[in-house]
Regions:
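Glycosyltransferase donor-sugar binding loop
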Residues: 137, 191-213
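Acidic anion/phosphate-binding donor-loop and adjacent secondary structure
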Residues: 122, 137-154
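Conserved donor-binding/catalytic core segment of Leloir-type glycosyltransferases
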Residues: 159-175, 181-187, 193
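Acceptor-binding helix/loop patch of EC 2.4 sugar-transfer enzymes
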Residues: 8, 12, 73-98, 140-141, ...
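Short donor-sugar binding/catalytic loops of nucleotide-sugar-dependent glycosyltransferases
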Residues: 9-10, 168-172, 198-199
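Membrane-proximal helix-turn-helix segments that form the acceptor-binding/catalytic region
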Residues: 66, 92-110
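Carbohydrate-associated surface elements
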Residues: 116, 136
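Active-site proximal beta-strand in glycosyltransferases
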Residues: 47-49, 63-82, 109-111, 131-132
Length: 214
């Protein structure tokens, strides 16, 4: 079997969760006998595994069906996740939902990162097979390492005794950044570090003010 992994605007989404999913999916499939291509011009594949939602993604799905190919959609996004993310996102969220549903309906099967996401998609009246499969992480990259711990503490000028709380994500409310800051203020005895970045011109004012310390 041959699978076409398609990611629209790879450079634009490279640092996002969706962008990193490409490498993880390629690595996961490397352990199987499945042949993988990322060439959108390929025509000899059996399954289109699509991860993005732009106009070109819509075109790829339609082309796949015309050629009699099967389509697996990776449901990274939902209406609920889109709301309260970017400035103005709530205004266009209903239209985004309609567009998402129109794409997901064209899939022969859908993969979601969590059972919760599967539940949300079922609420959109999608009847296809939906499989919740974690995006996963490369375990070897996050294995315990005294050397890395020392470098981390040296970089942030932390003593060996200091307790550190870490979170990773974009500056989105749904990522828990408001709760993270509230918790940090309540517990000054600990060091709180948030890893991640989003252009502050794109996020709601309450998030922007929070990051700027206003």
């Amino acid at each position: 079997m041959k699978v076409l992994l398609y990611f629209e605007n790879q450079k634009l989404i490279a640092k996002s969760g969706i962008g990193r999913a490409l490498k993880l999916q390629q690595k996961a499939l490397s352990y199987t006998d499945v042949e993988v291509t990322t060439d959108p011009k390929s025509r000899d594949y059996d399954v289109l595994h699509i991860n993005t939602y732009g106009v070109k993604s819509h075109y790829m799905v339609n082309q796949a069906h015309k050629m009699g190919k099967k389509v697996v959609y990776h449901g990274h996004s939902t209406y609920e996740d889109f709301r309260n993310s970017f400035t103005g996102s709530n205004l266009i969220a209903p239209f985004f939902k309609r567009y998402l549903v129109s794409l997901y309906k064209k899939a022969d099967a859908i993969i979601t990162p969590t059972p919760y996401s599967k539940q949300l998609l079922r609420g959109y009246r999608l009847s296809q097979y939906i499989a919740p499969i974690s995006n996963g992480i490369p375990l070897e990259k996050y294995a315990a390492s005294d050397e890395k711990v020392k470098k981390f503490r040296d970089y942030f000028d932390l003593s060996p005794e200091q307790k550190v709380v870490i979170s990773v994500g974009l500056f989105f409310e749904r990522k828990g950044i408001l709760d993270f800051v509230t918790l940090a203020k309540k517990h000054p005895e600990y060091v709180f570090i948030w890893f991640g970045y989003t252009d502050l011109r794109l996020v709601p004012q309450k998030i922007s003010r929070l990051i700027k310390g206003n």
